[in-house]
């Protein structure tokens, strides 16, 4: 269930084992968050489509526009003849901010995931001249850079912690700054203001960092008397994502945790219902794409064991071939100077405005050869 990275990974590895696999996907396209939440300037859709086409050619049947809900349940799937079910529905529910004025029917207010998805599938999105983004993760940065490309004159991010706590890479952060995104650290919105049901701006307060909280990051604390108002025509809330369990009918036999996620065995990804497994962001919450792919592979191994009647633990073996070290001799005149990685070329800033062209470009042939030659100095492992 779900044609995102986890579901497709599970389907691929099961198909490689010889099983007939069917994937049910609610949307008209596959790829999950890769297709509908990551903008084209970071990951072009055609790249994902090629990967999905390859998986389909491996024997995986992908049924699009087929949501799992109260009318077509997990139990219905089992009853229709499938011997095992793997739930990989992702974490596609935007978390609420929990402040006054957070109303989806106010003109100019969006949740980050919905905003990115609407833009990606070509749905008309109205953006004001001044855009405020609430949050500090990848969805917040992607939303801010997307808003610029849609024609916003000014885009500002409001993040309640410092740069050190901001969960984005240096590359993504630096690229956003280079494109003109303003980042306001240690600032927390307290209210979304509207004028006649149209976004008017954010009421905010400055913060200071206190002791670490449960996440290990220092807890932001409001500074009394530091309140201020930030005008904006559009507000995009991007403070996190969570799994959406609304497709489960009332009284579903599937057990949940106190965090409202499916309860699974951490090794075998099995739920309390025999033959039903779950994994990826749907179980763990938002993570890295490679972690989602690994969860799909683990799910495939677990399902294979289940169908074979094998109750042993799932072991994830490294698929890399072993390498044997051999001593080599060299001529004295040979250079052993370190060869550094060539810099990745980027689309010039002036070509990014109003364009969703991929900004991280490919190496030229010369640079590619230069990079390949560095492999002659690789550290080998047995």
Give residue spans per PLM region.
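Rossmann-like dinucleotide-binding cores of NAD(P)H-dependent redox enzymes
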Residues: 23, 27-58, 62, 144-191, ...
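N-terminal Rossmann-like FAD-binding beta1-loop-alpha1 element of flavoenzymes
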Residues: 1-23, 139-148
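FAD-site-proximal beta/loop scaffold in flavoenzymes
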Residues: 104-128, 212-288
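Feature captures the FAD/FMN-dependent oxidoreductase FAD-binding
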Residues: 1, 6, 13, 49-99, ...
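Mid-to-C-terminal Rossmann-like scaffold of FAD/NAD(P)H-dependent oxidoreductases
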Residues: 188-198, 208, 305-381
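A conserved FAD-binding loop/helix module that cradles the flavin
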Residues: 143, 279-313
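Glycine-rich dinucleotide-binding loop and its adjacent helix/turn
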Residues: 50-70, 94-150, 256-267, 271-272
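Cysteine-centered iron-sulfur cluster-binding motifs in ferredoxin-type domains/subunits
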Residues: 7-9, 15, 86, 281, ...
């Amino acid at each position: 269930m779900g044609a995102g990275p986890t579901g497709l990974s599970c389907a691929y590895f099961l198909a490689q084992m010889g099983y007939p696999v069917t994937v049910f996907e609610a949307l008209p396209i596959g790829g999950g968050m890769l297709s509908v939440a990551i903008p084209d300037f970071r990951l072009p859709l055609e790249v994902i489509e090629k990967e999905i086409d390859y998986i389909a050619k491996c024997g995986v049947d992908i049924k699009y526009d087929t949501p799992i809900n109260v009318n077509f349940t997990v139990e219905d799937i089992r009853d229709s003849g499938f011997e095992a079910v793997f739930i990989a529905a992702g974490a596609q529910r935007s978390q609420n901010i929990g402040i006054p004025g957070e109303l989806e029917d106010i003109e100019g207010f969006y949740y980050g995931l919905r905003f990115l998805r609407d833009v990606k599938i070509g749905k008309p999105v109205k953006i004001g001249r001044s855009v405020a983004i609430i949050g500090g993760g990848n969805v917040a940065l992607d939303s801010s850079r997307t808003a610029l490309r849609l024609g916003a004159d000014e885009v500002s991010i409001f993040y309640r912690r410092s740069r050190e706590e901001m969960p984005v890479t240096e590359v993504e952060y630096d690229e956003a700054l280079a494109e003109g995104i303003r980042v306001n650290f240690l600032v927390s919105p307290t209210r979304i203001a509207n004028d006649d049901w149209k976004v008017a701006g954010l009421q905010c307060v400055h913060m200071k960092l206190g002791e670490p909280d449960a996440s290990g990051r220092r807890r932001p604390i409001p500074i009394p008397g530091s309140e201020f108002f930030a005008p904006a025509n559009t507000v995009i809330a991007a403070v996190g994502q969570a799994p959406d369990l609304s497709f489960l009918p009332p009284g579903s036999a599937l057990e949940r945790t106190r965090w409202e996620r499916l309860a699974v065995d951490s090794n075998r990804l099995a739920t309390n219902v025999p033959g039903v497994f779950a994994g990826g962001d749907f179980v763990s919450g938002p993570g890295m794409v490679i972690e989602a792919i690994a969860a799909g592979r683990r799910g495939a191994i677990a399902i294979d064991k289940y169908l074979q009647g094998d109750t042993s633990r799932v072991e994830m073996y490294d698929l890399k071939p072993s390498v044997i070290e051999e001593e080599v001799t060299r001529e004295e005149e040979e250079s052993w100077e370190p060869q550094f990685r060539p810099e990745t070329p980027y689309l010039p800033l002036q070509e990014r405005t109003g364009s969703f062209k991929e900004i991280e470009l490919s190496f030229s042939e010369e640079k590619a050869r230069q990079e390949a030659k560095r492999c002659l100095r690789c550290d080998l492992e047995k």
